[in-house]
Amino acid sequence: MVGSTKFKAKEETWPFYISQFYYTVYTELQREIQQIKVWKYLGDEILLYVSIQDLGLDLDSRSSFLIKIPEKVYKVQSEAAKKIQEDLFMPELEVKSTVWIAGVQTIWSYENKKLDKNYQNIIATIDMEAKGETENKTENGAKDRDDFLGPDMDIGFRVAKFAFHHKVVLSADFAYLLHEIPTKIKDEEIDYKIDYKIDDDLQIVSYEILKGVWNEQYYPIVWYFPDWKSKDLLFFYDDHKKNPIVDRVLSGRIDPIDKLTQVYKELGKTKEIDAFVNECISCLKQ
């Protein structure tokens, strides 16, 4: 939720609306993605996660579901924003969302200081009972709390800076994965049935330097929106005054998602990203 500081300053009943926002987003996302879980709450942000291995019973259903995650997030984001405006009519309050992906490994022992070369991110499990916090159990009653740490986690927070209302911003790796899934699976001669091609809904709207990401090389900012041809639906009348990216979009200075192939190639990252995509598909098969 964006703009909540001003809202809290002038609205005495803000705790009710913030709590309602938490509840609405979580319950609606869980309705769309049953396996989703709360990672943590950060102020007016809700961080949630899902393992791609939990998305279905077979490769076809998991792959189809994965490709539709941006659509599902967009749906919930739009519904939450609509409810806020119906209840409060405060244009300065906006709902924004970011989706990214990372390969992680669980750290069972802190004696081994080296990570698996395929994973630069970890699941750090905190024993809540050892910390004297047994009352703060997770939603499934477990006594441990998981946190996700690593450079790919940081990328998600950096990319979130470019989130925009009525759009979903995706990390480049996640966008590339969604673009590649149909081709990769067909290459393996698997009968892949999907009636939805996400490429038309993803656009590279800008290239930005993100602190600590890609050695300060320009990073592609990807937005999801289901109807790029309808300019009247894309933005509010004054959005171009608030965000320079809007001008780029309206003037057509955007790139199709398959441009990512060239980006990774020119940065020498093709081998790395293809290995990641193959690893993700292996997880989808399990």
Report each predicted region and the residues it spans:
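Generic surface-pattern signal
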Residues: T27-R31, E71, K75-E86, S251, ...
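Low-complexity, intrinsically disordered regions enriched in charged/polar residues
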Residues: E12, S19, Y23, V104, ...
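Intrinsically disordered, glycine/charged-rich C-terminal tails and inter-domain linkers
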Residues: E129-D146, D154-Q286
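Catalytic beta-strand-to-alpha-helix segment of the class III nucleotidyl cyclase homology domain
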Residues: Q53-Q203
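Catalytic NTP-binding/metal-coordinating core of nucleotidyl cyclase/transferase enzymes
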Residues: M1-V76
